[in-house]
């Protein structure tokens, strides 16, 4: 199966995507090309072949869409731009802020923004605890960033302008029993949602959390 067909079929299998699959597919393939090109010298991701990137990066990022709210999204610890860039490509009406302290990864994401002409993405090369929220944030999301406790502790200020409605979503693999036990009472877990990534057998869970109003 060629890359275009693999990606197209994977996108069609995601419920609630509500995007132009052909257009989104072509943009995601260009993004994969950029990751592959930069990966040889910048070590952006341990996933090396484009076929695996489709499943483990693109589709894995997009299965969250039915479970997040816009229009203002913050992606914490974006790395090579995941999940924020696929989300921004699928939801051009949303604004996505990518937070990444690593310079080479932030520079790469900026190049992706230029190459794909992404007007709804901004890159912040800073530690998340230094970020000052501007607009009301609707969703703060992280993928392979840290433990739940650390994610919430470092990011909680991002929702201070919208504390009643803002949600934190951590993308996890297996059910994170130990991490859940370590969450302090100021944070509550609203849902733990098992998600299926097309073409991937590994377990995936979304942990939906919020801060309590003071």
Swiss-Prot record:
- Residues annotated as binding S-adenosyl-L-methionine are 77, 82, 128-129, 143
Q: Which residues cross the membrane?
A: none
The EC number(s) attached to this protein equal 2.1.1.170
This protein's encoding gene? rsmG
**Annotated compartments:** Cytoplasm
Its EC top class is transferase
UniProt KW Heme keyword? no
Q: Name one GO cellular component term.
A: cytosol
Biological source species:
Nitrosomonas eutropha (strain DSM 101675 / C91 / Nm57)
What InterPro entries does the annotation carry?
Answer: rRNA_ssu_MeTfrase_G, SAM-dependent_MTases_sf
Q: Which GO terms describe its molecular function?
A: rRNA (guanine-N7-)-methyltransferase activity
The protein's name: Ribosomal RNA small subunit methyltransferase G
Question: What exactly does this protein do?
Answer: Specifically methylates the N7 position of guanine in position 527 of 16S rRNA.
Q: Which reaction does it catalyse?
A: guanosine(527) in 16S rRNA + S-adenosyl-L-methionine = N(7)-methylguanosine(527) in 16S rRNA + S-adenosyl-L-homocysteine
Which Pfam families does the record cross-reference, listed alphabetically?
Answer: GidB
Family to which this protein belongs: Belongs to the methyltransferase superfamily. RNA methyltransferase RsmG family.
Give the Gene3D superfamilies listed for this entry: Vaccinia Virus protein VP39
Major subcellular site: cytoplasm
Q: Which superkingdom is the protein from?
A: Bacteria
Alphabetized UniProt keyword annotations:
Cytoplasm, Methyltransferase, rRNA processing, S-adenosyl-L-methionine, Transferase
